[in-house]
């Protein structure tokens, strides 16, 4: 019998998360572009972020790390990508994929993720000023393969933004 493992997925999904944050655009922008601030909220609930680097210019690279809680093994997972478009205080566009700690891309399956986990995502973050001191944040991730990891990623993204919103209160 031939191998039935899918190697190509015709249909791709897009995740869109919109949130109103009680902070001015400038502060929300810094929370996405200042490594020390990213480390305060990156990763889903109970995860921490011990490392982050940001080279904020078009063509610049970023590396974000999220650490699982001890109860889930405590492993570090790295995501890296390249900024493809930057409009300060308005828009960030970048690629995104699993990597090693130096930011070199790795096959997601090599760290235990399912074989259909995307090797590269395209992310757009829009920052819209509403009122004097509030921001509408719109995050769009495209190139997701339908499946369980897609669902987990939606939940994880909401948890990240919950952590960001809480951090912005301080």
What residue spans do the PLM features occupy?
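Hydrophobic/aromatic beta-strand elements that line small-molecule binding cavities or substrate pockets
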Residues: 19, 51-54, 79-85, 120-129
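Hydrophobic pocket/interface hotspot
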Residues: 28, 38, 62, 83, ...
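Short, P/G- and charge-enriched loop/turn segments at secondary-structure junctions
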Residues: 3-6, 69-71, 108-115
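Short beta-edge strand/loop motif at the mouth of beta-sheet-based domains
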Residues: 16, 36-78, 82
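Short, conserved beta-turn/loop elements at beta-strand boundaries and strand-helix junctions
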Residues: 87-92
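Short Pro/Gly-enriched beta-strand edge/turn motifs at strand-loop
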Residues: 34-35, 62-66, 105-112
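Beta-strand/loop substructures that line and gate deep hydrophobic ligand-binding cavities in soluble
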Residues: 93-96, 103-158
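Hydrophobic ligand-binding cavity/cleft-lining segments
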Residues: 1-49
